[in-house]
Each structure stands twice: as C-alpha cells, then as structure tokens.
C-alpha cells in the first residue's frame, strides 16, 4: 500500500499569491471558507438524526452505512474570539484550527500550550521512541501533554530519528507493518481514546487531533527557507509581506495526549509486585485495571503493546490517604489506589489481521494476570455495550467521523478496519460470556465480520442487516500462538 500523502500539504481553499500555493504544509479540511460554518460535532462525534433514521435506511448508501457529514470548524471559546491578533503573525495562531466547543477544559489546555509557544516556551522532543514526539508545556513550563505530529511518525518522511531509516535500508523486507495504514498513527491515538471513552474504560488519557507549530518540530530545509524569506519580506517590504497567507513555519497536525503524572512503566512495577505481592484489595483493583487494558488492546487490535508502553501509578504512602483530585481528574473522578494508563496507541486499527512476517502479539498475554478469568465487574460493564449491534454501529460511525478528516482517507480501507474490529468484538463477547481469561481470549481464531452487499446501509442497525463472518486462516511466518 502506498503511503498516503501528508494532510498538512493541501493548498488553501481560496486563491492566493504564488507564494501561498507553494507552501509546504496546509490545513486540509480546514480551509478559511469553512470557518464560517460551525461544526455540529467534533471529529469522532457523529451527528445522529434519529427521526430520519428510517428514511436513511431505505435510501441505502452503496459505499458505507455512514453519512458523509461535512466537518467544518468551530471556535473553542469566546475568549479566543476576544483575543486580538495582528493581520499577519510571524507564527500564525492555531487556535482557529483547535476548536473544541464540546470540551472547554481541553480547549483551555490547548490555549495554554499555544500561549507558551508564543512566548518562546517550545515543545521538547522526547528522546525515547522511534518517532518525533514532544512534551508540550504551559506558560509556567509545566508539561501538560504529548504531541505526536503526523509527519514525524515512525514511517513518516520527517521522522527525526534514524531507527526506522536504518531498518528500511538494512531490512527492507520487514520494513513497516503491512496490516496498518501508513502515517495514520495520530488517528489511531485519538481513536483509542474514543473507544476507551465509549466503553467507559477510563485508562487512556484524553487524546485529540490538534494543530501546532513550533521551531523545535522537524521541518525540511525548504519550509524553513520559506519561513525565513517571508519574515525578511515582511520586514523589508511590509506591503508585499502582508499579502502572504502565512508567515512562519506551517502548522503540523497530530495527536495531543494529556500528560499523566506519577506513573512509571509497567515493567518496573511488575518486577516489584513479584518480589512484594500486593495486598488483596489492591490486587483486585490492579486486576480490574489490567482487564480494561486487555479489552482496549483487543478491540483496537493494538500491534505494539509491550510491557514498556503502558504505565502504572501506585504509591504506597497514598494508600491510606485520598488521592489528589487533580491527578485523578482524567478518570472521571473515580479514585483508585493503583491505576493503569494505556499510552502509545498509534499502531492499532489494522485493515487486516497480521499475516505476513510478524504476529505482533500482546505481551500482557504472558503475565500471571492474564491467566485469571475476566471478573464479574468487567463482564457487567462491557457485555451490555458490545453485545448490542446498535452500539457497535454507533462506535463505527464515531470512528468514521474521526478518520475521514485525514486527507488520505479511503472508505473501502476504513470498512476493512471496521470489519477487523467487529470480528475482535465478536470474539471478546463470546469470551466474556464463556468466562474465559485474557490468555484464552488471544487463542481464539481471528475473524473478520464484513457487511454483506445485501445488508441494510441505514444508520440504525436492524436484525435484518446481514454480516459475513470469515475466519482468518493465514498466520504470520513468526507466530506466537
């Protein structure tokens, strides 16, 4: 599969000077003409017209059971409207693109991030990992989030780290993950939070798609040269410089995940727990949190879940005290003495099950916690959702609203992604009903559940809708189970 082109490289919607047309990165789906039309819902929030559901079902869209739904841009708060900005800014504000009317708290966090960048407190590149990711700070220099630009993903053209380049040169036959859509990790990150939120798992820190611009991001020489040239033109010939669509570096689209404090890698705590077993009440809490991680990873078919990219917070001195409300705010005020945070979800939502070189197993499957059958608590929480066909369809619609914002979006490929996810949900439903354990869950043969051509394409799923279930018989060359 060819890599989809960068979404940040679209020309602006309205005409402009030649300099505007040659800019390296543009805002796809966010043209200036669209700003006049407020968005009915943020990406990942499908707008549902239940009264017209029957009519839509009869219409029978041939491509997907999902409406096209234009996505416009709305402003995040009245405070942003009141902020006065010059006609031409050297670092163009991204607040117009980061609009979250339905989440004022997140909008405020993004506003603080933008203000910090404007005063010279730039995002700091994270040394770990195989892609360009950055700690984003507020004006007080406190880390508030992690930004992962699309163009700097592991297989992106502007990845500042050489790991994947060496991989591509030295071992091209194993380069990339053939089951994933290239350079859509930022959507996978946001999609994982969407699934987590819909199922009320509360283990993924809030993650959304945003736009940011910073001198510390990795840009090519052409973009930096253009930026310097436009700044020089604005300084020397203001009349000409003011005609540019943008002065400064182009904004980058990517995922922004809220930073969580007090967590360490799971590998660290798992070794601790082996030497010093947890008290029974804490052990039950950890088992519940672990099962939530299993459910999330299995549904989205995370292909990159080791014990080093999920986090655990457990501080013994706080066991007898109330956990800081601010630290637990992102888990809907539900207090836990031990808490798991599922980060690094950028390599999920495959369009087929892994069937080439590697199996990409879930490393948690070999932990002792994976041998314990799913608890009654988790079964009661999850089964009512995933056993409801309308809920599953609703989830697919929300993911459609999110994924379609990418310039390289393809409906057929998206439907393949949903077929894999529906198959995972089917297996999970059966495993929960049968009282299986996470280890037994991953041993169930993989299936895909495709919508048949004769199935209804309406917004509401009826029992008459027909799906085709297919067992995935082809296994990877290196298989773990």
Curated annotation (Swiss-Prot):
Please name the top-level EC class of this enzyme: transferase
- The answer to whether UniProt assigns keyword Cytoplasm to this entry is yes
Residues bearing Phosphoserine are 12, 17, 45
Found, by tissue, as follows: Widely expressed.
Region (G-loop) location: 126-132
Ranges for the region named Important for substrate binding are 153-155
Which residues make up the binding site for ATP?
A: 133, 148, 257-260, 271-272, 344
TM ranges are none
GO annotations under biological process? endosome organization; Golgi organization; phosphatidylinositol biosynthetic process; phosphatidylinositol phosphate biosynthetic process
Ranges for region Catalytic loop: 301-309
Q: Name one GO cellular component term.
A: endoplasmic reticulum membrane
An example Gene Ontology molecular-function term: ATP binding
Instruction: Summarize the protein's role.
Output: Together with PI4K2A and the type III PI4Ks (PIK4CA and PIK4CB) it contributes to the overall PI4-kinase activity of the cell. This contribution may be especially significant in plasma membrane, endosomal and Golgi compartments. The phosphorylation of phosphatidylinositol (PI) to PI4P is the first committed step in the generation of phosphatidylinositol 4,5-bisphosphate (PIP2), a precursor of the second messenger inositol 1,4,5-trisphosphate (InsP3). Contributes to the production of InsP3 in stimulated cells and is likely to be involved in the regulation of vesicular trafficking.
* Record family assignment: Belongs to the PI3/PI4-kinase family. Type II PI4K subfamily.
Name the chain's protein. Answer: Phosphatidylinositol 4-kinase type 2-beta
Task: Tell me the organism.
Answer: Homo sapiens
């Amino acid at each position: 599969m060819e890599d989809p082109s960068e979404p940040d490289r679209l020309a602006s919607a309205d005409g402009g000077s030649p300099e505007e047309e040659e800019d390296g990165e543009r805002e796809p789906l966010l043209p200036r003409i669209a700003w006049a039309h407020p968005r009915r819902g943020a990406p990942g929030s499908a707008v549902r017209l239940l009264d017209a559901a029957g009519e839509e079902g009869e219409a029978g869209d041939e491509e997907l059971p999902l409406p096209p739904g234009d996505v416009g841009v709305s402003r995040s708060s009245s405070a942003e409207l009141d902020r006065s900005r010059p006609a031409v800014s050297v670092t163009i504000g991204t607040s117009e693109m980061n609009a979250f009317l339905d989440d004022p708290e997140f909008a405020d966090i993004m506003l603080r991030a933008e203000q910090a960048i404007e005063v010279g407190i730039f995002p700091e590149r994270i040394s770990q990992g195989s892609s360009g990711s950055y700690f984003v700070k507020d004006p007080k220099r406190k880390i508030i989030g992690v930004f992962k630009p699309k163009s700097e993903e592991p297989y992106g053209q502007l990845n500042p780290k050489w790991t994947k380049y060496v991989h591509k040169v030295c071992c091209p036959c194993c380069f990339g993950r053939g089951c994933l859509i290239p350079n859509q990790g930022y959507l996978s990150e946001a999609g994982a939070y969407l699934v987590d939120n819909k199922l009320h798992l509360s283990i993924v820190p809030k993650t959304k798609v945003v736009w940011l611009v910073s001198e510390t991001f990795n840009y090519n020489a052409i973009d930096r040269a253009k930026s310097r040239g436009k700044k020089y033109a604005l300084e020397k010939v203001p009349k000409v410089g003011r005609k540019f669509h943008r002065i400064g570096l182009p904004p980058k689209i990517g995922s922004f995940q809220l930073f969580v404090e007090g967590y360490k890698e799971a590998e660290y705590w798992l070794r601790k727990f082996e030497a010093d077993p947890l008290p029974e009440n804490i052990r039950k809490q950890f088992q519940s949190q672990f099962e939530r991680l299993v459910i999330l990873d299995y549904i989205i078919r995370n292909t990159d879940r080791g014990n080093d990219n999920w986090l655990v917070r457990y501080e013994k001195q706080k066991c007898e005290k109330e956990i800081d409300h601010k630290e637990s705010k992102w888990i809907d005020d539900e207090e836990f003495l031990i808490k798991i945070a599922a980060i690094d979800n950028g390599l999920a939502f495959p369009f087929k099950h892994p069937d080439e070189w590697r199996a990409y197993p879930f490393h948690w499957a070999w932990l002792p916690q994976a041998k314990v059958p799913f608890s009654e608590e988790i079964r009661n929480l999850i089964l009512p959702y995933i056993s409801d066909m309308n809920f599953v369809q609703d989830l697919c619609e929300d993911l459609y609203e999110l994924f379609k914002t990418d310039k390289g979006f393809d409906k057929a490929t998206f439907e393949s992604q949903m077929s894999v996810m529906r198959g995972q949900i089917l297996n999970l439903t059966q495993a929960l009903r049968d009282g299986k354990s996470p280890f037994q869950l991953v041993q169930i043969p993989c299936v895909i559940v495709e919508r048949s051509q004769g199935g209804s394409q309406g917004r509401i799923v009826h029992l008459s809708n027909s799906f085709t279930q297919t067992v995935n018989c082809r296994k990877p060359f290196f298989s773990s189970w």
